[in-house]
């Protein structure tokens, strides 16, 4: 079973997360940030991960610490659930439309953390959520998961649609890249014989 439970506690936040990579897309998300909950719910749905997150953070300061730390813990959980990554597809990419918006996302579960994020927002906030925190989440996730992740919005107008296309794109590439490749026969998908070393 490809599952992981992580609890991370700092002076700023406490995040408890459970993920099942072979789930059905069920989620129970409570971060105290409505927009982030919405994005994580749709990520679970479209990745087909079962995902539970309970986060308590210093929201009286702002949403930065909670958003970043949820990204960190989700990345840690993905890495733990994948183990030695034997038999996974490893690579995936998608062009994800959301009404007037089109975003391209590409993923390599390589063990080498790197993010390219070419997405711009014309407004500073979506409701109470700072749009710059979308990038912070993706950076935290890529770094802690040890993945190479490229996110590029080719065009778009509505900030909510742009953010949603990024999260749905991440969901779809995760779903494809963690899938077990029957042709791989349990091999580690690397000529080095190991990932992340």
UniProtKB/Swiss-Prot annotation:
GO annotations of cellular component type: cytoplasm
Cross-referenced SUPFAM superfamilies: Ribosomal protein S5 domain 2-like (SSF54211)
Molecular function terms from GO: imidazoleglycerol-phosphate dehydratase activity
Pathway(s) annotated for this protein in UniProt: Amino-acid biosynthesis; L-histidine biosynthesis; L-histidine from 5-phospho-alpha-D-ribose 1-diphosphate: step 6/9
UniProt subcellular location: Cytoplasm
Enzyme class, UniProt record, top EC level: lyase
Database matches in CDD domains: IGPD (cd07914)
Pfam families cross-referenced by the UniProt entry: IGPD
Similarity comment: family membership: Belongs to the imidazoleglycerol-phosphate dehydratase family.
Protein name: Imidazoleglycerol-phosphate dehydratase
Name of encoding gene: hisB
